[in-house]
């Protein structure tokens, strides 16, 4: 099946999911013949399967549904297809294009009696005998095979009625012959109950965790269906599976699907329900559950929220919990060989479970059901939207690419939110008081891409609910100047997210950290926001001082939590503002509570280096005191790119002014270039302040003139008819001139000198401006940051004073 070029590891891990190609596997196609008991195949296929016209066959569909039908030949049908009508498809729970298997079923007996009941909403208002009008003509002389649980549709006397086969004798299938007794007494079956069984969860309803599903299938289905396999190879089949992962990824759903698809007896234990106030009763509840499952083997016991009943024994204070853990251990590993009982458990805190439970023989397989990637999210969206009416413009792939860090539950919420938005748009046509809603309105409802966009703006991933992560609304246009810095940043964050293949090609892991330093008010924070917005990554902003708390050890725990969250919501930009407050040089902090700041730094250092390379997590630090930051954080591999953000030069100042006044009406004669020339040494924040003040003055003038006008109107009503134009249509020169009177510089020359010096020393200790390889052709080598690695002796000759041990 798989080509030899495939890497073998991937192949085998999901081998169980592959459909085996067998001649009796056929693709479902729409029927021409509308009969409920007939399926048609092509003649060559019938010969291959050794079937004859009129044979009874057994069809197997999804979720272990079966149906018995009569097979006919149809020359228009292609070899690999099978034609069946809607009724048979519903009984098999399949759609057009799905694959079913067919096998001959020669030993179907004639039925002695069958019991059928109508479904209530199809018989409303029908008086008279159902049997005479519907059932008798349907079964007369037809010799139809039926199976218990089937639903069939009978047309007759103006309308169609659906019946369900409740009981057959002999069970489970038989042929209705002329002497079969047909009962149809009893209450009609409610449509709701029927729908519920239709909506059982199967493997198709789970998206985004193929590998995990394969693992679970081989753990559960192989021992239950073919225990001989394990006997032949001489090992005991595995007993326990522990599913863990963040909330909302579908752990309980997988267990339900496994139960429905395998047909094993399914016993659900909710963790907290076991507990009882009487001594010894909690343990006996557990024992009962296991006994019940053993009676009904093969069985699956599913323990939801395992951490509630099996916490670590040394941590718990209650005696009951300890006894329950011990009881669970002995049950899972009892002396008597447990017959075909598989225990599955789900939790989202695998590390708070008693370690004795996690050894081989108890919960020996731990399946991590993680946050899905883009293809997984697309699968999940397709599952959730398969019953939705989507407009043509909906692009689910795009939605999947934009929902970073969302789990299945978040995507389900997203779909329902989009659907609600579609309904809200039609709200003016819907009257709540009416009994029914107009059919036209119902048919015109469809979910458009705009609804999805709106829902996207509302939803954020549940893993990040408490640290509110929002993609900021700042774009590159909002930032004037700094072109080189922008390019550098794009390379840092956007390339690894958008072109990971290039990094693979050149064999490099992308760098993960940047430190902005420079005088206050030059747009360091703004840059970090813009980069998060541009590449649609999640953005967590951490204010330095918030991490420090008064409790011993809590500050470090905060750091750990933040990094964990970022990993879950990757791609993610972690932005440490005011880095100098938490990453001061270690050792000098006298009077600091028990050295908390030092421990926080150590934690940050280990987190930055222990970042798993798979995840796209970027760290951006910003500070205006680079001289007091611990040097260990500045080494390559942590914050390896140090970017100095200087005060803007004249060109940048023009750009900043333009960016600030993008949305404001400015008079034509305001000369921004001249303004930029005059404001030498001003930071970006100072320029923004000038613009704000000019706007404020214009607003003040406009409001005052309106008040004046109002007064005039009251004194002279006849002047009202004349429409006057806006008194202050734009920001004029005099507003800027007035604003310039209050303008001030926030960064003194002295400070600037300090930053320049720091940047200078960094450049010197890091780069080799004049470095060339000793060959004939002069390779292009500019001053490269942080590339002083492979140049052995040069380090000591150029700047000896910088070396500690020189």
From Swiss-Prot:
UniProt modification remark: ISGylated.
A GO cellular component entry from the record: site of double-strand break
Entry's EC annotation: 3.6.4.6
Single Gene Ontology MF annotation: ATP hydrolysis activity
Position of the Glycyl lysine isopeptide (Lys-Gly) (interchain with G-Cter in SUMO2) cross-link: 8, 18
Intervals of motif PIM motif: 802-806
Known role: Necessary for the fragmentation of Golgi stacks during mitosis and for their reassembly after mitosis. Involved in the formation of the transitional endoplasmic reticulum (tER). The transfer of membranes from the endoplasmic reticulum to the Golgi apparatus occurs via 50-70 nm transition vesicles which derive from part-rough, part-smooth transitional elements of the endoplasmic reticulum (tER). Vesicle budding from the tER is an ATP-dependent process.
Name recorded for this polypeptide: Transitional endoplasmic reticulum ATPase
Gene of this entry: VCP
